Amino acid sequence: AHPYVDLINAAMEKTHVQKLGFEDAYMTVADYRHYSEKLHCQLVPATELLISLRQSKDEEEIQRMIAAQRIAEGALDQIVKEIKPGVTEKEIAARLQYLMLAGGAENMSFDPIVASGPNGSMPHAVPTDRKIQDGDFVTMDFGCIYQGYCSDMTRTVAVGHVTEEMEKVYNVVLQAQLAGIAAAKAGATGHDVDAAARKVIEDAGYGPYFGHSFGHSVGVEIHESPN
């Protein structure tokens, strides 16, 4: 028998509960059949309910997410000292993973993204063997899991000399980020936050090149609601 079956059945009998909710979006057909046969209760799809419950985090959950973010920040502090011409995107990605695991992470929230030079135009680029060059922007998107909760951060660093246009774009993105943060408050929607950041970029003339949403929520999964 599955190790969880006896525990679940005992809990259901003790509480006299007859229905058990499950995340149907994440359960295989084989698992569903297995649990339907072995559990002494009715399985009821409850993905939407669980998603809504996870929208609000309690203090313990928040502290775990903060701890996960601190680990990622520690990795960033070190990796920026190591990014230089000749190092490949893959090497930076591997180093980020090592630093986060060494810093106390259980695992990665997702495979780190490291995109340099022209690869930075792809929001979900996969690290390649491309070597960092002088004058590159290097964008890193990464995070880790601590006690079951995810962190996620994106940072862009400049290597050596950058052009005036690159510096301008960097600062436009920074101001957009700050505008989004200022708009993120109780009662605001994800659309409100995105719109505040997007307006800064559009007003600067870069609207057509903003091909991604401003952000997303995190928790036990790397993408959670509200988005």
Regions found by a protein language model. Name each.
Residues 1-227:
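Active-site neighborhoods and metal-handling regions in enzymes and metal-associated proteins
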